[in-house]
């Protein structure tokens, strides 16, 4: 609320005016100190705060607190983790953290099958500002000494005594100091393979002019690795030694040069307290990576915004100076084995649901996880739609030579759209249905939806559905009851909103008094046949016209 002043938004001259604006808008809670400010409290005592608005937000807040028994069960006492759950940092919990980190790691490159590495290599160089500085992510609670295990410590624990591990930071995360890059280059030149850990700094206690690169209020204008990290990467790659890049980050970075220079690339994100051992598990083949990208990695910052599910355009899909296609697309990720897809089956059921099945086979030499992803493309619709949309996915584990059937069921809501009236509807028509291990290709410069699909069965399978059902929501409004409040000069009007249509949809109910919006806007989500009762408060002596609206319908009372 304090941001309404000159601190940010300039809609209020001081905190008192900001508090009045917030109370008028029904803001009951404050992330900050405006409502606790001594001047604001004194202003309330002096009558400079609108007491009607203050009463309204207090009523809302107290009702919520009573409903949740917050006065009987105070949740605001200082927390003692050992009393709440004595085993919170037990071996079992650490193993769970390690498994979660393993499952999330994404392998982007593995040229010449460099990975997995041998645990009997003579010398490994572990370089970079993140190598011995695991990043936990923004808003991480205070950690115990030794709780965070770095990639360096994970590698040292994984290899045998005969393997020498060399470590050099090379540079820090963000400063322009490059004086230690030659030390890293020397270590790389003495090694059989280089593991570089580069990326983000999320630590709030960053010092020595090292800034956070991610988290709240930390934005970067480019996607180049911060500080001297890109220079460090290029200098080390110039030694000719095979380089494994581990991107420790919570965002995409520009990895175009890295993809050309490095033999292998892993993204271990901000991997939690067991991130180092988990990364080592993948590096040395104790765990076969099966993570998939939850975001698109562009070739260049100039491609942004870049989403897998972009809407069709009135122009061609190309750049003059580079490919339109991203470097690594949404849902992408490699494995130490290979998979093939076949036998796509698509069936529309009598209730409008769509059954989709496909067979996935492990055609490689080791066991591994595959993430089978279901995408659809609405080929022709009454409004512009996205070129593809992810609708479901499942992660399966397959032994070498093993096949499994993956099955998905789409509901009408899954293939619905918002029409030109912003109503959610399902339209008849042609849909492209795709199941694969990554998001589908889209390589055309024009007629983009026609090009969406998989080029071979190692990526996925594609089929067509001629959908024959139509669905839509329809809402009714009615006054359910009116209650007189015995403790104040108000009455409560209970409004019934019901979905009498055939599709789940969302909406909002608004109250107008004398043609002006009054009270809170209440949002709802209703399935077919579902009804919700919504209370609105009115003064008992109100003699002005009152009406309620939702979805182009008005109910005067």
What are these regions (language model features)?
Residues 4-8, 38-49, 63, 87, ...:
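C-terminal non-catalytic regions of proteins with extracellular/luminal or membrane-system context
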Residues 1-32, 38-39, 45-53, 60:
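Second-shell residues forming the walls of enzyme active-site clefts
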Residues 59, 63-86:
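Conserved, charged catalytic cores of large soluble enzymes
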Residues 34-35, 56-57, 72-79, 116-119, ...:
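Short coil/turn segments at secondary-structure boundaries
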Residues 14, 34, 77-78, 150, ...:
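General structural signal for secondary-structure boundaries
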Residues 31, 35-39, 67-77, 284-288:
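Electropositive, surface-exposed helix/loop patches at the edges of structured domains
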